[in-house]
């Protein structure tokens, strides 16, 4: 499998890399939180731009990106507009979604953008091509906050992301029971063993699925989300605890 190198971080090798989300509403909140990150173990910062009050004014978005880049130094920055249909804070028209992501990629301040794979193939391709042209990597994503699809369906979605040339396919699903967590882990193992030629990210959400956020190095998920202040999805552990567990598992493997 090929790894993905972003600044000093190599995704897909060794310990799963920790992504910490920022979900502030105001510019002040966002930058203040970012300033606390030098004291905690973070590999990538995700700015959940759908939470930002000025998200539909690109000049304001770029202003925050510029300051984030300055505060974060060499920490890679992922910008994500999570749409309301996939659990995010706001709705957005597909063309506006494409424009936001491509313009952000072109600023030079972001290292990755997140693209929801079922936005429509034309829009998805436009964003992936636009980001790549700007030297920015793409996480293609899919979220099911209600259920866990069948193993074959999870693998199909991840393979679709890979086929559309996303750098890192990502899926997050909600377990209704413990067996659903096993389904997600089995899909992860099968995808990485049989199909993936690049890193993937998978997780089973909520408390029931928390084990999936810890065992990525065993089954093949290359990144995991930890909360510094406010979790952006159910089941996220605090980043310090997450880092400790990932390290203990890595050392024992």
Could you tell me what each predicted segment is?
Residues 7:
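Glycine-/acidic-rich phosphate or pyrophosphate-binding loops and their flanking alpha/beta elements
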Residues 2-4, 14-133, 143-147:
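Active-site beta->alpha loop and helix N-cap motifs at the rims of alpha/beta catalytic domains
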Residues 112, 117-253:
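Catalytic alpha/beta core domains of metabolic enzymes, predominantly
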């Amino acid at each position: 499998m090929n790894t993905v190198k972003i600044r000093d971080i190599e995704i897909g090798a060794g310990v799963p890399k920790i992504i910490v989300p920022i979900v502030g509403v105001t510019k002040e909140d966002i930058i203040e939180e970012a300033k606390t990150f030098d004291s905690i173990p973070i590999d990538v910062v995700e700015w959940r731009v759908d939470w930002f009050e000025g998200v539909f004014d690109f000049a304001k978005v770029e202003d925050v990106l510029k300051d984030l880049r300055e505060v974060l130094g060499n920490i890679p920055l992922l910008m994500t507009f999570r749409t309301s249909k996939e659990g995010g804070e706001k709705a957005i028209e597909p063309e506006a979604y494409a424009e936001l992501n491509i313009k952000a990629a072109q600023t030079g301040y972001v290292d990755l953008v997140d693209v929801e794979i079922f936005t429509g193939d034309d829009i998805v391709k436009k964003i992936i091509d636009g980001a790549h042209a700007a030297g920015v990597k793409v996480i293609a994503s899919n979220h099911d906050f209600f259920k866990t699809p069948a193993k074959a369906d999870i693998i199909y979605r991840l393979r679709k992301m890979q086929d559309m040339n996303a750098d890192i396919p990502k899926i997050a699903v909600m377990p209704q029971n413990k067996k659903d967590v096993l389904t997600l882990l089995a899909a992860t193992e099968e995808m990485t063993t049989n199909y993936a030629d690049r890193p993937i990210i998978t997780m089973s959400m909520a408390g029931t699925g928390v084990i999936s956020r810890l065992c990525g190095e065993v089954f093949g998920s290359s990144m995991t989300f930890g909360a510094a202040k406010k979790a952006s999805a159910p089941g996220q552990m605090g980043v310090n605890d997450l880092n400790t567990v990932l390290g203990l598992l890595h050392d024992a493997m």
